């Protein structure tokens, strides 16, 4: 038990502070915006302080643990704790949410509700990453869906209600399987039901039952990640949502699925994971190729970026299913890396839409001369997306490759085949990424429009751009900055596979 309730404060602060937005004076939207940004900044600084001064990097066990008995009837605890696996996603959540609130500056309609929902989503995400009780994890997982649904249905494009309904149907459908898995694991085996992660990690199940539990969790995480064929909500949702919501979806929401896959499926159900991992490897490989081939056919700019997200998530799935130190560390690095890159691409797609009011790539062209700063930013992040050496995506994909090649679980022939198919996927990525830049920025299509309409990016947008670009280059040059957080925890997780 920690001496002070740091994690409870970090989880509860955003939603509590967000509920006070209703009490702010009605003096336009500026007060609400600054209040929300200050709360996000304070939360990020508090989280960073706690991790710098109260977290020991060389200890793979759970730290800063908090445990309050919440409901006596069935041993339900408010149980929080962090380790090397959850630090990266929590800091990423704070960083991207802070930037997304400053990206939401142009939102004027119902801005109080909009900013409250962003803060509520922040609490749900941090709660999911830091919960050490399976039912609390489920509650936080669900808490985060309600703000997303409202953000999608109230702010966005013409088809926003359709895409929001599709999102909630998919994710709520997946959550049913998650709840069944949570209750099944909690009620199995012991006289008293227990939902504590530590107790469940030492619990053994009959193989058939473990496979059923694993499959239930896998469906929930496959919807969220997304893993094909449960990915079809993602392009629609991204195509219609406001770009600050897209930043949160691409930067954090998709990473919750991958985090759950490691935290629950790998840690608590190791035997089932070693049975399922070859199939996950195949699905991940197909996903990279499928998304890379589907992306060039998308006319909508944001849908094309969404398919690139699906392709990048394929690398994470392959890293998780390689069951090696390098593979899993690479997957965690890719989670952080794509969190930055995905958020940045959606932010730039949104800012360019604000200026030219065009969604479809075949209507665009010639923006580079009119808006050189946006062109420079977009080109930089396109390079990061296609894993240019010196940027975080390259290191993550390289480490995942290393994980597959060194994996003792797979035969040499299957490793060569998977690596070959992944390499094809990496060759296809520049094709859709660079063709997107070409269609947007080159040509003469927009030259006959009066140029007075177009304003290049201002200081706020350049600041957000630099805030995302610096970590991408920093991690690309010195990946140990992220890997040092997770390396001990990864060894602990994998010890179940080789000694269990």
From Swiss-Prot:
This is NAD(P)H-quinone oxidoreductase chain 4, chloroplastic. It is an enzyme of class 7 (translocase). It comes from Nymphaea alba. It is found in: Plastid, Chloroplast thylakoid membrane. Belongs to the complex I subunit 4 family. It comes from the Eukaryota. The chain crosses the membrane at residues 4-24, 35-55, 80-100, 113-130, 134-154, 167-187, 208-228, 242-262, 274-294, 305-325, 330-350, 364-384, 386-406, 416-436, 462-482. GO terms for biological process: ATP synthesis coupled electron transport; electron transport coupled proton transport. It catalyses: a plastoquinone + NADH + (n+1) H(+)(in) = a plastoquinol + NAD(+) + n H(+)(out); a plastoquinone + NADPH + (n+1) H(+)(in) = a plastoquinol + NADP(+) + n H(+)(out). The lineage of its organism: Eukaryota, Viridiplantae, Streptophyta, Embryophyta, Tracheophyta. GO terms for molecular function: NADH dehydrogenase (ubiquinone) activity; ubiquinone binding. Its EC number is 7.1.1.-. Keywords: Chloroplast, Membrane, NAD, NADP, Plastid, Plastoquinone, Quinone, Thylakoid, Translocase, Transmembrane, Transmembrane helix. It is a multi-pass membrane protein. GO terms for cellular component: chloroplast thylakoid membrane. Its main location: plastid. The keyword Ion transport does not apply.
């Amino acid at each position: 038990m920690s001496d002070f309730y740091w994690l409870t404060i970090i989880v509860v602060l955003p939603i509590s502070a967000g509920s006070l937005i209703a009490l702010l004076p009605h003096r336009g939207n500026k007060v609400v915006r600054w209040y929300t940004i200050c709360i996000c900044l304070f939360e990020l600084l508090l989280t960073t302080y706690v991790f710098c001064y109260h977290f020991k990097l060389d200890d793979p066990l759970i730290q800063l643990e908090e445990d309050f008995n919440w409901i006596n009837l069935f041993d339900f605890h408010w149980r929080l704790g962090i380790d090397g696996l959850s630090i990266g996603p929590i800091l990423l959540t704070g960083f991207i949410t802070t930037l997304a609130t400053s990206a939401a500056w142009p939102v004027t309609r119902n801005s109080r509700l909009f900013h409250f929902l962003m803060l509520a989503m922040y609490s749900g995400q941090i709660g999911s990453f830091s919960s050490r009780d399976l039912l609390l994890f489920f509650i936080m997982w669900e808490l985060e869906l309600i703000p997303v649904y409202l953000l999608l249905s109230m702010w966005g494009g013409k088809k926003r209600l359709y895409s929001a309904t599709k999102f909630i149907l998919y994710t709520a459908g997946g959550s049913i399987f998650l709840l069944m898995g949570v209750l099944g694991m909690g009620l199995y085996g012991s006289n008293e039901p227990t939902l504590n992660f530590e107790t469940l990690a030492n619990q053994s199940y009959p193989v058939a039952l473990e496979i059923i539990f694993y499959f239930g969790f896998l469906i929930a995480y496959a919807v969220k990640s997304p893993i094909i064929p449960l990915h079809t909500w993602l392009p629609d949702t991204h195509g219609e949502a406001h770009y600050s919501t897209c930043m949160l979806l691409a930067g954090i929401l998709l990473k919750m699925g991958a985090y759950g896959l490691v935290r629950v499926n790998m840690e608590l159900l190791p035997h089932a994971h070693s049975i399922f991992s070859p199939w996950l490897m195949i699905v991940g490989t197909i996903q990279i190729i499928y998304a890379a081939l589907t992306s060039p056919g998308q006319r909508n700019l944001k849908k094309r970026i969404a398919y690139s997200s699906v392709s990048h998530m394929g690398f994470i799935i392959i890293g998780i299913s390689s069951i090696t130190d390098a593979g899993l560390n690479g997957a965690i690095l890719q989670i952080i890396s794509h969190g930055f890159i995905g958020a940045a691409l959606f932010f730039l797609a949104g800012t360019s839409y604000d200026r030219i009011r065009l969604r479809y790539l075949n209507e665009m062209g010639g923006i580079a001369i009119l808006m050189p700063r946006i062109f420079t930013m977009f080109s930089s992040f396109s390079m990061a997306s296609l894993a240019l050496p010196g940027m975080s995506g390259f290191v993550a994909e390289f480490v995942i490759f290393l994980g597959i090649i060194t994996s003792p679980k797979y035969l040499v022939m299957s490793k060569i085949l998977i690596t070959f198919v992944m390499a094809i996927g990496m060759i296809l990525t520049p094709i859709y990424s660079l063709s997107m830049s070409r269609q947007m920025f080159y040509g003469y299509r927009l030259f006959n429009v009066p140029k007075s309409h177009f304003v290049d990016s201002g200081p706020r947008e350049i600041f957000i751009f630099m805030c995302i670009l610096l970590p991408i280059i920093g991690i690309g040059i010195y990946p140990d900055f992220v890997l040092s957080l997770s390396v001990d925890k990864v060894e602990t997780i994998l010890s179940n596979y080789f000694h269990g």
